[in-house]
A protein has these predicted regions:
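Charge-rich, low-complexity N-terminal segments
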Residues: 1-123
């Protein structure tokens, strides 16, 4: 099963720049790998992240979202003190969006890859 997940930062703060952005992507890929999921595509924008993920049928999408948000928040805030200053208690907004995707992933991959055109963020 494939899911398109979107996580927004708390208060929609634009905190993902340069090395924080790259590190967020690395951390999320590692978490998904540890969960046995396939990270098909990821795009970290200044205030949100899009992930296309293949999830085994033994795990629920909400469990994956919860783990990715919880662990990435903890690790990023530990590594980058500036995040604790900008967003005191938690990195992510409490809710997230995730939608099941069929087997034709091309349109979703295109959409995720081209977020910078929509939001003006990095490629």
């Amino acid at each position: 099963m494939y899911d398109h997940m979107i996580f927004h930062t708390k208060y929609n703060r634009k905190v993902f720049q340069n090395n924080i952005r790259k590190r967020c992507e690395e951390i999320m890929k590692n978490i998904l790998d540890d969960l046995g999921c396939e990270c098909v595509e990821i795009n970290v924008q200044p205030n949100h992240v899009h992930i296309l993920v293949g999830i085994p049928l033994t795990i629920t999408p909400s469990h994956v979202a919860m783990k990715v948000k919880r662990i990435s928040s903890w690790l990023l805030r530990r590594e980058f003190a500036v995040l604790k200053q900008q967003i005191p208690k938690a990195l992510w907004a409490p809710s997230c969006t995730h939608q099941s995707v069929g087997n034709d992933l091309t349109k979703v991959i295109y959409y995720i890859r081209n977020q910078y055109k929509k939001h003006g963020g990095p490629k």
